[in-house]
Structures are given as C-alpha cells and as structure tokens.
C-alpha cells in the first residue's frame, strides 16, 4: 500500500572544509502506515557533535512513531479523537528519547582534547551537553486513515494533496523564527514544534527535507513545482530514485552548498488513481513557471532601465 525513499548528500561547503555531513534521513514502510524523517545538525562551533545529534533525532522519532503504532487500530482511534493531543504526546516522547540517546552517547564518549581545543576553558564550561548535539527534525507519517507531520527548526514538509496540488502545511518561516534557536537541544523544545494533520482527505504523498533543498530554489513556487515533478515519477520510484539522488547532489554543490536530505512516503493506490491529475498539474505548473520567468525578466529590465536613467541624471548634474 505504501512506498517511499530517502536520500542524504553532503554539501560542497562541508567537503571543502573537511566537515562531516550533518544531515540524517530515513523512511520506513509498514502494512498500516509509513514514515519519512529528516534531521539537520546545526554544525556550528558549539554544536560539534550535531552529526550524531541528527542521527539520534531520526532514531528517536522513528522509535516513537513505531511505539505509538504498536496497536494500529487503537492508535488510529485515539488519534482521531484528539489529533492535537496525540501529536503533542509524540513530540514530548521524541524529545525524551533524544535526550536519553544524547546522555548515553556522551557518557560513553567523553569530550576529547581535540574537541575542546577550539574553546577557552570558560567557554567550554558554558556549553550544555544537549547543545553539543543540536539538530532540527522533520517527521511525516502517512497512515490508513490520516496523515500528519511535525517539525522543529528549519526544513520543509510538502504535501501532495488529493487534487494533485502541492502545498506546505507548515510554512518555512514558521519553523525558522528570527533570533531563536528552534532546536532539539533547546530547553523549551516542546514549545517550538509545529505540526499539521489531515483526516478528511487521502494525500498522494508527503515529502520532508532539510533546508539545503529549500534554499536551493528561487521561490516557494519553484520549490513546490519540484515536488510535483517528483510525485509524477513515484510510480517508477525504484528506477527514478538514483536520478533524485543525483539531482540532490547537484543542488548541494551550488547555492548555499549545504548538506541536503529528502525523504518521501506515498500511498501507491491513491497515486495510481491520481496519476493523470499529477501529469496535468505538472503541465499547469510549467505554464505558471514560464509566466513567472517572464515577469522576473520584465522586472529586471525595468530595474536596469531605471538604474541607467539614474546614472545619466547623476552625470548630467556633475556636468
């Protein structure tokens, strides 16, 4: 009933600097549900084990969903009676599991002299253990009776709806608040999760990705169109998956040159029913993309003319 894929590629900037990949991703498909997860370790100076942190976030989320779904019928009944409450419980469970994994790793792997050498003694004392492993997390679950997702920090979740339209039920800006570290390592992490659920429709697919993918596009429209193109190829996912990875690698070499992860799960039956709608949506998107390109070109030409006019005016005044 369900299928999916996941890919993680290292960014060019990390290859150049000799930094390990900070991203992690996974997908799982079961009889009654499927899961797609990505995480992006922060990678900055004080988050020097965030590559491990992202791996732990993926594991914590996967284990949480599997535990809640241990009795699928009972879980579905509970979820439908209180979606917000169940998602909040799952978020708390993920945080708790992640913190336990962090402490477990830390106690068995004390900080090395090499890890400490970048800090003064005073600076190092101020760093909390959880912060060392800081990471974002995006989780999507597609089941028999509903689809839901939750995330903390930047990254994106794209839903391919029943009508073949692509949308982001959780806005990108919502998960990247200014001046706030929306992270698994935040002491108030539970307050920075954002979620969505859909119980009245049967989505075709759901994608989750780290911010390396989103920032490689010029606009939200282009970003969503990309997912429509991918959705249109999901029926041949085994053959198409290598091309997806190749494209992600190409994107990770340009733009922000960041690590990039993309994971997806989809309903095979709904996909088969809606494949013609997806093809039509891709063609409509192409028309809109051409219009956007023409409008962008016109704006650039207008700005170019305006700049030339201003320069001519300055030269005249100087004379």
Regions of interest found by a model, annotated:
Residues 1-22, 100-128, 170, 278, ...:
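Short glycine- and acidic-rich boundary segments immediately preceding or forming the N-terminal edge
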Residues 59-101, 227-249:
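Helix-loop-helix
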Residues 1-67, 155, 186-190, 196, ...:
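N-terminal entry segment of metal-dependent catalytic domains or homologous docking segments
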């Amino acid at each position: 009933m369900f299928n999916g894929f996941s890919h993680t590629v290292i960014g060019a900037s990390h290859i150049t600097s000799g930094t390990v990949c900070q991203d992690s991703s996974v997908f799982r498909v079961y009889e009654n549900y499927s899961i797609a997860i990505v995480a992006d370790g922060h990678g900055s100076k004080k988050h020097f084990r965030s590559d491990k942190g992202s791996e732990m976030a993926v594991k914590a989320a996967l284990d949480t969903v599997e535990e809640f779904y241990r009795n699928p019928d009972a879980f579905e009944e509970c979820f439908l009676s209180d979606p917000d409450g169940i998602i909040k419980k799952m978020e708390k469970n993920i945080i708790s599991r992640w913190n336990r994994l962090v402490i477990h790793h830390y106690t068995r792997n004390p900080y090395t002299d090499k890890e400490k050498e970048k800090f003064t003694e005073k600076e190092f004392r101020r760093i909390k253990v959880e912060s060392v492993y800081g990471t974002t997390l995006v989780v999507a679950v597609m089941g028999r009776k509903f689809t839901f997702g939750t995330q903390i920090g930047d990254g994106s979740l794209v839903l391919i709806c029943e009508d073949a339209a692509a949308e982001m039920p959780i806005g990108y800006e919502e998960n990247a608040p200014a001046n706030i570290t929306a992270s698994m390592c935040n002491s108030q992490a539970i307050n920075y999760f954002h979620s969505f659920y859909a119980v009245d429709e049967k989505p075709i697919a759901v994608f989750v990705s780290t911010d390396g993918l989103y920032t490689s596009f010029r606009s939200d429209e282009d970003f969503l169109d990309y997912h429509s193109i991918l959705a249109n190829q999901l029926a041949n996912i085994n053959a198409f998956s290598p091309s997806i990875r190749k494209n992600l690698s190409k994107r990770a070499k340009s733009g922000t040159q960041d690590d990039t992860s993309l994971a997806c799960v989809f309903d095979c039956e709904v996909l088969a029913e809606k494949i013609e709608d997806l093809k039509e949506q891709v063609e409509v998107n192409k028309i809109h993309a051409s219009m956007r390109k023409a409008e962008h070109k016109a704006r650039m030409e207008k700005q170019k003319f305006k700049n030339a006019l201003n320069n001519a005016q300055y030269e005249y005044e100087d004379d």
